[in-house]
Amino acid sequence: MNAPSSPDTRTNYRSVFISDTHLGTRGCRSDFLADFLRRTSCQHLYLVGDIIDGWRLRKSWYWDDSHDEVLRLILRQARGGTEVTYIPGNHDEMFRQWLPLGLEIAGIRLRREAVHLTAAGKRLLVMHGDEFDSVVRYAKFLALLGDWAYAVALAFNRYFNAIRRRLGYPYWSLSQWLKRQVKEAVKAIDRFESALANEARRRGFDGVVCGHIHHAEMREVDGVLYINDGDWVESCTALVEHHDGRLELVDWAALNRLSFFAPRRIAEPATA
C-alpha cells in the first residue's frame, strides 16, 4: 500500500467512505479527521451519515476552527472533481426532508442511499443503517437517552485521554472498550450486522457499507460482504478502496500513535 510517508504526502484512493463524524460535538475528533482529509484524495467520497450532529443544535453545541476546517476540506475535494455523496443519518436527519428534491449543493449530492460499483466489479449498497436499529426507529426517547449517556461516556473519555497524553501514553478509547465488554451490546451489534447483510442479499448486492453503530468491521455474513466504516468519535476509522478494487479499513488514530505514517489494516473480509 502506498501510505503517506510524511505529513506532506497525500495518498490517492479510488474511493473513501467516512461516517459518524458528529461535527458540532466535543467528542468529534476533528483534528484526526482534518489530518486524514488533508492527506488523502479520491475519485469518490461517501459521507455515510451523522456528519453534523443535529441532536446537539439546541444544547451542548460545540464548534471550533477544526470543525470548519473539516467542512472546507470536503468542499475543496468536491470543487477539485471528487464525486461527493452525502447520505444523512439519524443525527443529521434534518437534511432528509430535502432528499425528494435530489439536491446537489456545492458539488455534493444528497441521497438517501447509494450504489457503489468497485473497480473489481462488486456492487455495494451504501446506507447509514439507522433504519435497522429498532431503538432509533420505534423509541426515539430511548435513543435520545442513550445518546445522552454516550455523551457522558465520551466526556469522561476526553479527560481520561488528557491524563494519558500527559503521561506519554497513546490515545485509547475507554467507551469502545466498555462497549466490547457488555454482552448485550455485542449481541446488538451482531443483530445489526446480520440485518444489514440480509437487506443487501435481498436486494441482490454483493455487500453493504454502513455506519451508525461506531464499530468498524469488515467480514462476510452468509456470503455477503458487511462493512462498517466506523466513526470519528472513538475509533477514527475510514473505509478506502484502492484502484484495483481492494477494500481496506484504515485506523487513523493508530496511524497517529506511530512515529511513521503507515495505516494499520484492521481487517479484510474472511473467505466464505
Show which residues each predicted segment covers:
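Hydrophobic, well-structured mid-protein blocks that either form specific transmembrane helices
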Residues: 120-128
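Active-site neighborhood of phospho(di)ester-bond hydrolases with catalytic His/Asp-centered motifs
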Residues: 18-19, 45-49, 85-90, 111, ...
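Core catalytic region of metal-dependent phosphoesterases/phosphodiesterases
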Residues: 2, 8-14, 23-119
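C-terminal regulatory/interaction regions
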Residues: 2-3, 252-272
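Active-site-proximal loop/helix segment associated with metal-binding centers of metalloenzymes
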Residues: 127-192
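Conserved beta-sheet core of the metallophosphoesterase superfamily
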Residues: 102-113, 130, 134-144, 191-253
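Anionic group-transfer/hydrolysis microenvironments
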Residues: 21-22, 52, 130, 253
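Structural motif
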Residues: 119-120, 221
